[in-house]
Amino acid sequence: YMNEYMKETNEALLHTYNQFPVVLDHGEGAYLYDTEGKKYLDFAAGYAVSSLGYGNQELNEALKAQIDKLFHTSNLYYNTVCGKAAEDLKRITGMDRIFFTNSGGEAVEGTLKAARKYAYKKGTGRYEFIAMKESFHGRSFGALSVTGHDPYRAPFEPLVPGVSFAEYNDLDSVKALVTDKTCAIILEPLQGEGGINLATEEFMKGIRKLCDEEGILMICDEVQCGMGRTGSMFTWQSYGIRPDIMSMAKAIGNGIPVGAFAMTEEIAKYSLEPGDHGTTYGGNP
């Protein structure tokens, strides 16, 4: 089966997805409708993105109003909405400083740079990362370098050096990889692509304690498991700990390309400064 839309897409786009033979036309709530009028209950939610459903009128009206007013200026200028959005994220994360991005992968890249800059400014000489086996953090070069899934990594190696991989939920495995060059430990509190693996309380608290004792930063990637998907706003909040840096995206925007990374004030004091990092579209109104 091949209609004009599929044919046009297949002839023009790079083939990086094996797409279902369905051409979607519109959505309403939790349902999607194709060009032939068939109705589908959507369990995928756009890869954990469509948190408010399809055709959400309140969201649509807000978007229309802002587009008519102003939708991009760059981060060289203040605008009327970015600060409020950042304050909202501070409130729900308990973090102190926010940086807006265009995607989850970009947010993860920011967390890695923030950790490296912190170590650089502190003069520790640390640069290595410990990540988890079967993790997924994104497809850009830095994010892929801390992704512990060989089929995704193999075609692009060598990747960023200085990354080692521990067994998930195995604190001894993590401890065995710590050196005086370890800059940060990055993990998903709930692994998605790795098989819906939930971190144990012992593991999360153990990582936090290890980081505190060894002068290592703890990074939690909440791009997929965050925004209320596990009973708390962010999964790490269920463990009674707080990471130093975190990433988020997907369900924040309900399909609008927005993500963010956040950090504590202590990290921000010694981390990214003007000239260290940027984004062309991130944080636009």
Q: Where would I find each of the regions flagged by the language model?
A:
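Conserved N-terminal phosphate-binding loop of PLP-dependent enzymes in the Aspartate aminotransferase
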Residues: 1-285
